[in-house]
Amino acid sequence: ECPVCHAKNAFNEVKGEIKLAAEHKFGVYAETVKNNPDISEEDKKYIFDQLMANFNGECSEVGMYLCMARIAHREGYPEIGLYWEKAAYEEAEHAAKFAELLGSDLESNMTASTEKNLAWRVDCEYGATAGKFELAACAKKNGLDAIHDTVHEMARDEARHGKALQ
């Protein structure tokens, strides 16, 4: 019965295991290309290199687009700034899809397990906090206030990420 209109035939009861018609998968490259004897080593290398290059390119675009958004906002172009932010998010989605295709071939610590990924990234965020703090201290020592202030704030962000993931 429909919970809104109370029609008797609005729903069909599902019995047994539910099967999804389609689903995203982690590590498609390893599953379909890496050990596939029907694909030449040359093509395997090309596919892997292009997946990696696209992942890295998409990640770079995220940073550049957000930088351009900040510039546009400072110059008084909020609509352009907001569009750059939207484009950056879309590029981040592209990077995520390349990462998902590459799976553990992108980063051996990355797995299809949320629990394992959380534990790994907590350690990474704590390491990133320390690394950025050291860079900020070096910048401060050399009188580079803009670099110090920006990187020190990023270190705090990394610490917050680590705490949140913990």
PLM regions: where:
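Non-heme di-metal
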Residues: E1-Q166
